[in-house]
């Protein structure tokens, strides 16, 4: 079975989301609901399939298919870079890193020593080397689940490091990527120059998703018995985000309640954690999984986590400005909790 990729802007249509309250979304229904924002696919988008280049989904987890139609032991990755992941045994996943001093290895070492942060991430089992490569050894978050539903939600209003946008050089390649997605986005001056800065492009990119407005964006999901859908980054409006999450939860009251409690727990631990007080957390995801018997949610992917200078204080909620290092991860958790609360209330009233 192959992973499904959708390389174009899309949105949910409200009309096609009008299922009965007991309906649960499946892969075919998702495909039917995905449409272009302007109801036709532009040739420039066809030729620029990676124009948005939203950073890769974070899930360092492989999905072991347990469907009868799929050979036993077949592995599929929900999202991310498949070449960086190696399935292990006994509930362990290996994630390839650059070396023992890789930024993510440093982050996990710090998190493992924090009484609060360590409760909301995959268990860190150490760093190992094999055949010249270096790997993180992490808890396989899907171990023990059977044919689960999975969602990857990238957190934060800013999903790029400040160091990535310091260069003010005007770039024609980023201008071309911008107009491939949104031809009217550049200003008259930018059209004249046929170039934009990387900061301008990155901010545009965040606005194309729900990252800027909600502090999170849905990267990918997989429903029970279906292949992953790995390009939902432009699901943006309040209604579309709400409906996507609601359909993912299949109106399962107990699942929604347990996940809501876990999200609140994650928020509380972040607020108490010394690690989070001293680090910006950029590009991390909340990884949600449930099956018929269990639920789980963890914060994953710390490749872009950076320790702050001693004089820098952040609250993870304030609006980002260059130099303040705010990334908005707690703002996003607040928004996500609010949506889960609304879904829970709706489920209880029906």
Report residues per predicted region.
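Polybasic, positively charged surfaces/segments
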Residues: 2-350
